């Protein structure tokens, strides 16, 4: 199983003003984390890939499909994206404001992973589906400084683990649901022909108080899945026998 690894570089200087934690080596002040991020999906552990996968409840019509670009709509159970071998600590303020509109598929930056894909109801009936992002494995509490930004169409939500000191959500974020679940949303009444556009962004927040030397050498695994629900037909009303 491939995992995200957190390492330290003593030869690069963090130049952004809002990174305030530094490590002094000689006359150089440095604070940098390097990350090898991975996401697993679809029963297969893929090294150096970020993947989204699709599930259906048993014995249902497969109405929901996922694809990377509108020019290549093919039914798939999973999508794979490129990742970066190294990812330095970042800040939410550094991220481009147009991440959810700039490109389809992989469009990573120097210090974040970004992947855009589409979910469409392409078949013949209105459905409900669930979207989840789940933490598979954590070593050295790397999730304490993790940020996951989810764009669904034009709606943006930033997810983070609650503060370990106050138990409250970090500023400007929505708290993870629990230790394993970053987010879980149920999309209802998803009509035939309707499309949801997702952009997922993953980075390590350098301004988080938990972003310390203790994370160095840690690992994390995260995956996302979409699950189409079985459609339950309403029962026909029965005439009551009054005799």
Model-derived features: where do they sit?
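Generic structural motif
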Residues: 66, 144-148, 200
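Sequence-level detector for tyrosine residue identity
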Residues: 38, 45, 53, 67, ...
